[in-house]
């Protein structure tokens, strides 16, 4: 079976030299594509470069790939490509990674998903919180009901060689694309008056279309020890540094799922989830136990955040083995691969026109 996987990124990726220990993964969507390419038989990746987009060649690149490979289906995770994808007359799977945000892009999303559903495309979300958010938004903004989805897909898994460390350097770390919404430097800002806690931000220096986001990149070049910052690291090094943290923090309440939260827990690192006023974070579904994470409002004071980091690290110090073991079992490669294979097989046979039991597959 041949599955075409077109993908793109939205900014220039920081380059690494040949001595780098691995590929730079700029975000969860990019990691999902790489995981598919590395682990699922029949995946044919089609990279849409920045130059392709600037030259308006996206459709041509994908059309040429279809002519070359004659795929059985197309799997894509950019719903704004929907009209183009439907024009190819190839069976479609759409993975909805979109976060829980309200911006101008989302105004038409309900209509897009409805039209995809009507066309026979199989749509999968990554978490129930994400589905509920987008259902409610589509109804409120456009009075649209986009219909039943096929189920939920975990966007990633934990490999067998996840690092585990007892040599802990950082009191708290985070990973995030360098933009003002994700706000990875929030942990530095919260701890700016603390002299004895080491915080680590791992991010990128992307070049974005938005001047606001580019300003955020430039405004956070000044941090110095004990506010550590590492940019453009290969994914393998990111995971190593996470494993050497006493606590990990997810700074964005609007995550659709939370791959880095899963990776942190898989390294045995207890995780702080920053929430909005609704006290909800989609990454709660990732943890193997409610005791493995702690929720705190993103608007908390620096003192409150510092106290949380200190106390949660002490409380969970002797449970890191448990956190790692339980999370790795819940998010094993074999379980993830089994679900992806089932998604592909279901699309290939196209026998089930209603919501499948994938809804319960990852509970």
Model-derived regions, located:
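A short, active-site helix/loop in glycosyltransferases that binds the activated sugar's phosphate group
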Residues: 104-146
């Amino acid at each position: 079976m041949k599955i075409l996987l077109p993908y793109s990124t939205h900014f220039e990726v920081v380059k690494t030299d040949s001595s780098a220990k691995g590929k730079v993964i700029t975000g969860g969507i990019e990691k999902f594509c790489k995981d598919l390419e590395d682990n699922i038989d029949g995946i044919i990746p089609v990279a849409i470069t920045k130059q392709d987009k600037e030259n308006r060649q996206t459709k041509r690149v994908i059309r040429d790939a279809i002519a070359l490979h004659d795929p059985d289906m197309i799997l894509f995770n950019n719903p704004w490509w929907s009209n183009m994808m439907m024009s190819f007359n190839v069976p479609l799977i759409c993975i909805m990674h979109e976060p829980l945000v309200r911006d101008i892009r989302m105004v038409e999303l309900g209509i897009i998903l409805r039209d995809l559903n009507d066309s026979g495309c199989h749509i999968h979300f990554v978490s129930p919180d994400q589905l509920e958010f987008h259902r409610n938004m589509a109804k409120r903004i456009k009075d649209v009901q986009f219909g039943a989805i096929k189920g939920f897909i975990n966007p990633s898994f934990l490999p067998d060689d996840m690092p585990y460390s007892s040599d802990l350097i950082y009191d708290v770390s985070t990973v995030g694309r360098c933009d003002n919404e994700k706000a990875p430097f929030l942990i530095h800002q919260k701890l700016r008056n603390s002299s004895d806690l080491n915080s680590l931000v791992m991010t990128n220096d992307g070049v974005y279309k938005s001047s606001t986001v580019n300003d955020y990149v430039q405004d956070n070049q000044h941090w110095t020890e004990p506010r550590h910052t590492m940019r453009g690291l290969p994914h393998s090094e990111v995971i190593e540094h996470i494993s050497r943290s006493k606590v990990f923090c997810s700074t964005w309440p609007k995550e659709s799922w939370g791959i880095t939260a899963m990776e942190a827990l898989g390294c045995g690192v207890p995780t702080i989830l920053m929430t909005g006023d609704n006290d909800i974070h989609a990454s709660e579904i990732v943890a193997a136990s409610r005791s493995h994470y702690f929720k705190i409002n993103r608007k908390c004071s620096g003192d409150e955040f510092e106290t949380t980091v200190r106390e949660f690290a002490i409380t969970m110090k002797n449970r890191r083995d448990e956190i790692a073991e339980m999370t790795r079992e819940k998010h094993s490669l074999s379980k993830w691969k089994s679900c992806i294979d089932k998604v592909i097989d279901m699309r290939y046979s196209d026998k089930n026109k209603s919501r499948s039991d994938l809804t319960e597959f990852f509970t």
